[in-house]
Regions:
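Alpha-helical transmembrane segments
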Residues: 20-31, 142
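Membrane interfacial helix motifs at helix-loop boundaries and amphipathic/re-entrant anchors
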Residues: 32-62, 103-133
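Cytoplasmic membrane-interface segments at the C-terminal ends of transmembrane helices
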Residues: 3-18, 66-93, 109-113, 138-165
Length: 166
């Protein structure tokens, strides 16, 4: 994982597929944590509509994770040819947020809710602290994934590890 691979590659010390895996796992963990802590802090359920069950929430997180991975890969996938921009974090955030809202909406429809209830649940999430928790999680993890690819840092070395030391 160090930058001195000897092949002359121009990307950072972490390859794009590895950065994508780390950032995606971090996003999944952080979005679940963020939704739970937001629920604890506000005293409200993430999906407060009775009878919907867990399917809309699961569908929303799965859709958000897939959108996150796709958008982040679009930002960092060709790092050998170009330097990835941190603007990719903004696009990844937008894609993840919209996919979460859309996934919850589709999940609510799948569980048998009518169109008005599904739209109400999705609208509440989009305009509440829960939507902000999803967007913030996506932004932090996308920024981190891009930073992993952009960095030119190498692993730390102690003075006695220098092979040219006398």
């Amino acid at each position: 994982m160090t930058a001195d691979r000897g092949s002359g590659e121009s990307h950072g010390s972490v390859r794009p597929p590895v950065a994508l895996a780390f950032a995606s796992m971090g996003f999944a963990a952080l979005v679940i944590f963020g939704l739970g802590m937001t629920s604890l802090a506000t005293g409200e359920a993430v999906i407060a509509t009775p009878g919907l069950g867990q399917v809309p929430g699961i569908a929303g997180v799965v859709c958000a994770l897939l959108a996150f991975a796709g958008a982040l890969w679009a930002a960092i996938g060709r790092a050998e040819e170009r330097h990835p921009s941190f603007w990719g974090a903004a696009w990844t955030t937008a894609a993840s947020f919209l996919a979460y809202i859309g996934g919850v909406w589709l999940g609510a429809l799948f569980t048998g809710a009518d169109l008005g209830v599904a739209t109400g649940v999705a609208g509440r999430l989009a305009t509440s602290w829960f939507g902000l928790a999803v967007a913030a999680s996506a932004f932090v993890c996308a920024w981190s994934g891009i930073a992993l690819v952009r960095t030119r840092a190498r692993r730390p070395r102690w003075p006695w590890e220098d092979e040219y030391d006398e």
